[in-house]
């Protein structure tokens, strides 16, 4: 339930240009926009493009095509693909990410890990293979992981509840710098949210562990402002009842549906059917009823 007295400065829509956006993304964007307009928050468009080997110009353009098709507004950020490339790519904020990584190194909060994905297959959480090996931080082809413990954290929700929680086991010693030397999602996301002054973060239930990891990282970095932010985690749209939608599911992409002649109103209506809403959805403002 949305606190009707809530007021925020800024929220964000943060797609990744690694595939065509689908109806699950549309739901997240629409909810973000609905909450923003209800609470007076500006909407920042932030394109998360640090996974460079997966970035495709077609997917970047699809972000703008999808937002415009669905009439999802944004107040800040790139207006088109060229503006994004010239002024808003995360690559232009690398100094900010490097400063945070250097702080973690100076505080001795990170360790070097050379484990490959295949070596970690079958483990539900990081087994600590490299935790005590004291490998130099400048070892080539390695990642940096954060030393984590069992400390408590508090999460503020959209209805003003405070949840006391701990880092999920699956996020133990999570990665903050990848083997390609780019910052990992958890670090880049918190740095960006602090940099842009985002105080309301809307994301799917599947990213709840990431929220806890980011609150943990904020505590390590001494970023108390991040710990004051409000979070809303929304239900996911599921395929076949138990699998979340993915960008590889072409038939649910907005691009595909648009090509089949569906209108924006039809896409919203389809989302409403999947969620079995009492009232039909026709535009992003209608998603306020889902809160």
Model segments located where?
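Non-catalytic terminal extensions that flank enzyme cores
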Residues: 1-20, 38, 43, 141, ...
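N-terminal Rossmann-like or analogous alpha/beta NTP/dinucleotide-binding catalytic cores
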Residues: 2-125, 206-225, 277
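Proline- and acidic/polar-enriched loop/turn elements at helix boundaries
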Residues: 48, 79, 116-117, 230-233, ...
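Short, Lys/Arg-enriched charge-dense amphipathic segments
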Residues: 64-74, 97-113, 131-145, 249-266
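A short, terminal or domain-edge coil/loop segment
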Residues: 68, 99-109, 163-170, 280-291
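Short, surface-exposed acidic
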Residues: 74-77, 225-231, 265, 278-284
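Low-complexity, flexible helical/coil segments
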Residues: 79-85, 146, 222-227, 239-240, ...
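Active-site cores that bind ATP or allylic diphosphates and position pyrophosphate for catalysis
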Residues: 112-246, 253-258
